[in-house]
Swiss-Prot record:
It comes from the Archaea. PANTHER family: ISH14-TYPE TRANSPOSASE HSIRS44, PTHR39967. It comes from Methanocaldococcus jannaschii (strain ATCC 43067 / DSM 2661 / JAL-1 / JCM 10045 / NBRC 100440) (Methanococcus jannaschii). This is Uncharacterized protein MJ0139.1.
């Protein structure tokens, strides 16, 4: 099973992890994934604040909620997972860049 932002989004919506939807689910997922991949909380919030106002504390909260969903996937597919996340992120980044 390949893990993409769409699969993560479906699982988050099923479990109702986020009570409020002031920020889009995609931004919350992207924040959690960027932190998971090694960026600091402040760097993630600085990067995403170009699109929406987001604090480093929000990034931390999003990550801890998304972590529950990410831990459900088998560990042997971690490399494929990271590659698909990066591809999904680049598609999202290019889409946002085309809007500006």
């Amino acid at each position: 099973m390949r893990l993409t932002i769409e699969v993560i989004k479906e699982r988050i919506v099923e479990r109702k992890l986020f009570k409020r939807n002031r920020k889009s689910i995609e931004v919350k997922i992207l924040a959690g994934l960027l932190y998971y991949l090694g960026l600091s909380l402040r760097k993630v919030s600085l990067f995403l604040s170009q699109f929406e106002d987001i604090s480093h504390e929000s990034v931390r909260i999003y990550y801890h909620k998304i972590k529950e969903v990410l831990n459900r996937f088998p560990s042997n597919s971690k490399f494929d997972t990271v590659v698909s996340w990066i591809k999904s992120f680049m598609m999202f980044y290019n889409w946002v860049k085309s809007l500006t």
